[in-house]
């Protein structure tokens, strides 16, 4: 009985380890190769370590029509994303149903990713997106995000409640 219980516990720990190994990429639409996922995860790791923000990439075919923004925001809110007390982070969604990309930010990331910078981030991967090179598009998006983080917050920026 003890051997069976030990084997079961080891199996559960292995399952949990595998589930947590790729926490920055949820490729529900099946757009990325294994190599692309590895590179995307490495860039996310680098950003997370340097800036203490959570980075997450999500792809989906199942976003309801006209709900891309709400889907991204809700996914961030209800899936435990974000670091620290302010749940700082960024989610990048590729919505294949509505044919849209969206960035959702929380915490300190709001201060770094202004509307203008968000457009620059989306533009960085646009050509690859049009060519259906989704993995390369995300890599460019993340590298542009990292560039803006290195530049720091823009002067004169402020937040207001919507």
Model-derived features: positions:
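Bacterial N-terminal signal peptides
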Residues: 7-17
């Amino acid at each position: 009985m003890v051997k069976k219980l030990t084997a079961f516990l080891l199996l559960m720990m292995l399952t949990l380890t595998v589930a947590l190994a790729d926490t920055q990429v949820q490729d529900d639409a099946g757009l990325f190769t294994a190599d692309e996922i590895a590179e995307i995860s490495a860039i996310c790791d680098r950003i997370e370590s340097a800036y203490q923000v959570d980075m997450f990439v999500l792809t989906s075919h199942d976003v309801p029509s006209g709900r891309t923004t709400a889907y991204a925001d809700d996914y961030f809110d209800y899936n435990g994303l974000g670091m620290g007390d302010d749940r700082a982070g960024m989610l990048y969604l590729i919505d294949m149903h509505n044919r849209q990309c969206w960035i959702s930010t929380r915490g300190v990331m709001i201060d770094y990713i202004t509307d203008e910078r968000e457009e620059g981030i989306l533009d960085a991967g646009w050509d690859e997106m049009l060519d259906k090179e989704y993995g390369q598009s995300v890599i460019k998006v993340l590298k542009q995000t990292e560039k803006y983080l290195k530049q720091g917050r823009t002067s004169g920026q402020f937040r207001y409640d919507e």
